C-alpha cells in the first residue's frame, strides 16, 4: 500500500463535502458515480483493488452515523469497530461522541486511506485502521456494519464471526436497505 499514491487518487477523484442527512460530518466523496468508475477502472485493475465503494456515503452508513450523533450515549466510552467501513462515516460519528476506542476495518486499501483522510478532516483520531479482521477474537463493545450482507458469499464469510462476537458480549448492529 502506498498511502501517498492512494491519497492523490482520492484527492483527484473526490471532493470534500458535508454529508446529506449527517451535515456534522464531511467526507471525500465522488461528485458523480460515472466519472470515478470510468476513470478508475484500469487503475483499479492494475492495483488489484475493488470498485470505489468508499467514495460514497451509503444510506446504511448515514443511518448509523445519524443514530450515533442523535444518541451519543450509544457509543460513549465504548470500544467501537466500524466493520467494512468504506468511508468511515460510522467511526467518525463515534469519534465525535466520545467513543473510548475507534477502529475501522476494510479489506480495500483505498477504503483504509479514505477512512484515515476522512477522520483527519473531521478531527477524529482513529486508534486502529485494519484490513481483514474476520476470525480474530472480539475486542470491541460495539460493532457497526453498514450493509455488509448484500452478497451471499460475503454473508457466509462474516456471519459466523459476527455471531461469535455477539456471543462474547459485543453489540453487533447491521444496517441495510
What residues fall within each predicted segment?
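A short glycine/serine-rich beta->alpha loop
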Residues: 38, 46-55
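Hydrophobic beta-strand segment of the Class I
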Residues: 143-144
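Conserved SAM/SAH-binding loop
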Residues: 129-135
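N-terminal auxiliary segments of SAM/dcSAM-dependent transferases
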Residues: 1-36
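Conserved SAM-binding loop and adjacent beta-strand
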Residues: 51-69
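C-terminal substrate-binding/active-site "lid" region of AdoMet-derived donor-dependent transferases
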Residues: 155-177
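Conserved SAM/SAH cofactor-binding pocket of Class I
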Residues: 65-127
Amino acid at each position: 500500500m502506498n498511502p501517498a499514491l492512494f491519497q492523490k487518487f482520492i484527492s483527484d477523484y473526490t471532493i470534500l463535502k458535508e454529508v446529506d442527512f449527517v451535515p456534522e460530518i464531511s467526507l471525500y466523496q465522488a461528485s458523480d458515480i460515472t466519472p470515478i468508475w470510468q476513470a478508475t477502472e484500469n487503475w483499479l485493475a492494475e492495483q488489484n483493488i475493488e470498485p470505489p465503494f468508499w467514495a460514497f456515503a451509503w444510506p446504511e452508513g448515514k443511518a448509523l452515523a445519524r443514530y450515533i450523533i442523535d444518541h451519543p450515549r450509544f457509543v460513549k466510552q465504548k470500544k467501537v469497530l466500524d466493520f467494512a467501513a468504506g468511508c468511515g462515516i460510522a467511526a467518525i460519528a463515534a469519534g465525535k461522541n466520545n467513543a473510548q476506542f475507534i477502529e475501522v476495518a476494510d479489506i480495500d486499501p483505498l477504503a483504509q486511506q479514505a477512512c484515515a483522510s476522512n477522520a483527519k478532516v473531521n478531527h477524529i483520531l482513529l486508534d486502529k485502521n485494519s484490513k481483514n479482521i474476520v476470525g480474530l477474537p472480539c475486542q470491541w463493545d460495539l460493532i457497526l456494519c453498514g450493509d455488509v450482507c448484500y452478497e451471499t458469499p460475503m454473508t457466509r464469510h462474516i456471519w459466523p464471526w459476527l455471531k461469535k462476537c455477539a456471543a462474547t458480549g459485543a453489540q453487533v448492529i447491521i444496517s441495510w436497505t
